[in-house]
Structures are given as C-alpha cells and as structure tokens.
C-alpha cells in the first residue's frame, strides 16, 4: 500500500527535522520500528472500529489511541532502551501524527456525519480565529475552529475548508493559493457530554497546508493520491504486506 508508506515516511521526515528528536532517531535507529508500529496501530484500529456513527467512532478512537500510547511507550523503554523522557516525546509525536491523519479523514468525510452548520466568528473584527458550529446526524455537537495565524482567511475560504473539507482546496488550487500563505490548524472539538467532561480528550487537530506543501500538491497534481490515502488507511490495511 504505497499511500500509507508515503504518509508515514513524510511524517517521520518531519520528526527528524525537529531538533528535539534528531538525537533519538540517530542513536536508536527507530525509523523502521516506528513504521511497523504505524501499520500495527492502523490494523488494530480498523479491526475495532467499523461504524460510521460519529459518537461510537470517536469514542473508540480516543480509547484505542490512549491505550496504544501506553503500549508504544512501554515498548520503546523495554525493547529499544529509550529513556522515559525520550519515549514520552516519541509516543506523544506518534499520537499527534495519527490524530492529524484521523482529523484529515473526518474533514474529507464531513458530509457523511454533519446534518447542519452555522458560522460565527469569535470576533468579527479579528479573522485570526473563526468558528463554526455543526451538529452531526446522530446529535453530536461539534465546534470547528480554524486558527488562522496570518489573519487572511475570509469567510468563504473558511467555509470551504471546514464544511466541504480539504479536498476542495486540492481540487481548486486557484482559490486555495490566495489564502494558504501560512501554516494553520483546524481543530475539531467534540463537545457532547456522551464523550467526556474533559473536552480536550476529544479534540483532533490537523495542520493545514503551508507554502511548501502548496508546491508539492499543486505543482505535482498529487491531491488525488492524498485523498485516496486517507481512505486506504482505514479500509485497506489488511492488504499491507
């Protein structure tokens, strides 16, 4: 499955550029080990989660992800000789990365879950933070926030990003390049009490593309592969060799 390998290797490359991680990767040679854990993580997740229901899907995701963090952390310490500090950093990065991929998946599949949406800026005079409210078909309240670091994201751009998904940007580069000048995050916070009183447990973040990714996706016309990869991760992992 080429898409999975591409995603995981690009994530690992980003980790290697992080100064806090460089020594860990160089001394422990963990690249192939972490790639194996990626495959194990997604295979296990697919076997436990098959529902299109947003409540059960997200609850299962958080429970599985937290449990896997403990397993991965322990394996880094016991099998790879990492210090507790090193193992914590790597396991946190791992959890953050799989969280990003899941958030991307939910955004691209938004229409399958969401029944109605409204748009309400946090501060109409400051487009740095813009919010939308959505309600899923099974009654889950979802707050969607775009942290717009450079302040140039207008209403239409936000609506296309949050409501119709990142796919819109990749298929409409003429509209995307005008405002994707700085990296930003999309935060999905599931606030319904059926999840948890601690809303942070159910917050998914995805880093939206910045200048270098614009070059990669739009110049190479690689967005179809990206779209397919999100589905492949959850649907076709039994074919990974």
PLM segments and residue spans:
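Non-catalytic C-terminal interaction segments of nucleic acid-processing enzymes
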Residues: 207-241
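Catalytic centers of nucleases
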Residues: 94, 98-166
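Solvent-exposed amphipathic alpha-helical surface segments
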Residues: 110, 172, 237-240
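Extended, compositionally biased low-complexity polar/Lys-Gly-rich tracts
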Residues: 64, 100, 107, 130-134, ...
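Catalytic cores of nucleic-acid endonucleases
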Residues: 141, 146-216
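Glycine-rich, flexible loop segments associated with nucleotide phosphate handling
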Residues: 88-95, 127-130, 180-184
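Interdomain/boundary linker segments immediately adjacent to catalytic/signaling cores
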Residues: 1-102
